[in-house]
């Protein structure tokens, strides 16, 4: 039976999930996780406590409980359960109070509320990215913070969306397709915004596998075509001095981190 894990918060539980995932990923085992957001009342906290205790009775193992709860009275109820508590927020609050010389003033939903001053900026970035996905238009390319380039299915769209959703970056993307390969060059609008360009590449065999799952037995998905496109695009990156990274076997989070590291783009945290 898998070890039970609870992610609990009086907000969205995103912070507890991210922290918990980061810690548990260090161990080569699987876990049975349950996320419980918006534990905002003592009554709900008691319900959660019962779930944790029932899990302990059923399995004989104390559940791992990662939480980020602002209100002390609710937090204390979770503390009193049979779970093993890992309190992300309050582990660091007391030491920081000493260093900063002030008391914390906790507010529920401060980290993930719509009132957050960066909310509108993030929505604006997401809308921009969706409107400028896959080379739909180059009219507003000058408003981009970043333009991702690459062959079809190399990871441009998920990387663009992740950057806009997580960091408020206006990330357009532009594809190079089979018809471009005979005379591969940058469109004028991209040349005029060259400082914003960043390339993605991928192992041709991996690209072949991805395309096969979408359009099997086609020229588009053939290994030969994948090799041609990757080779031509990488040569163009080098010729135009466009920085690029290989996305093969990397998660969207890793790709985005590499892009931010190379470009120096500012991360807007919300």
Curated annotation (Swiss-Prot):
Reactions performed catalytically: [pyruvate, water dikinase] + ADP = [pyruvate, water dikinase]-phosphate + AMP + H(+); [pyruvate, water dikinase]-phosphate + phosphate + H(+) = [pyruvate, water dikinase] + diphosphate
PANTHER family per UniProt: PYRUVATE, PHOSPHATE DIKINASE REGULATORY PROTEIN 1, CHLOROPLASTIC (PTHR31756:SF3)
Protein name, UniProt field: Putative phosphoenolpyruvate synthase regulatory protein
Binding-site positions, ADP: 150-157
Coiled-coil intervals: none
Keywords: Kinase, Nucleotide-binding, Serine/threonine-protein kinase, Transferase
Family: Belongs to the pyruvate, phosphate/water dikinase regulatory protein family. PSRP subfamily.
């Amino acid at each position: 039976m898998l070890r039970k894990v609870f992610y609990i918060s009086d907000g969205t539980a995103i912070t507890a999930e991210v922290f918990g995932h980061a810690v548990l990923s260090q161990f080569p085992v699987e876990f049975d996780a349950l996320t419980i957001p918006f534990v905002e009342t003592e009554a709900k906290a008691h319900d959660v406590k019962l779930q944790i205790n029932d899990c302990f009775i059923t399995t004989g193992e104390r559940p791992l409980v990662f939480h980020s709860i602002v209100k002390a009275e609710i937090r204390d109820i979770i503390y009193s359960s049979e779970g093993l508590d890992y309190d992300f927020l309050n582990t660091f609050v007391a030491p920081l109070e000493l260093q900063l010389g002030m008391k914390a003033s906790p507010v529920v939903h401060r980290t993930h509320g719509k009132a957050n001053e960066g909310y509108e900026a993030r929505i604006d970035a997401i809308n921009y990215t969706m409107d400028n996905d896959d080379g739909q238009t180059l009219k507003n390319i000058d408003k981009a913070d970043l333009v991702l380039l690459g062959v079809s299915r190399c990871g441009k769209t998920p990387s663009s969306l992740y950057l806009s959703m997580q960091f408020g970056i206006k990330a357009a993307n532009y594809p190079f397709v089979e018809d471009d390969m005979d005379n591969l060059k940058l469109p004028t609008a991209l040349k005029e915004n060259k400082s914003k360009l960043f390339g993605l590449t991928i192992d041709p065999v991996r690209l072949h596998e991805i395309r096969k799952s979408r359009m099997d037995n086609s020229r588009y998905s053939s290994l030969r075509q994948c090799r041609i496109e990757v080779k031509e695009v990488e040569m163009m990156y080098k010729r135009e001095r466009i920085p690029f990274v290989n996305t093969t076997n990397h998660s969207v989070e890793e790709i985005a981190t590499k892009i931010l590291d190379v470009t120096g783009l500012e991360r807007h945290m919300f």
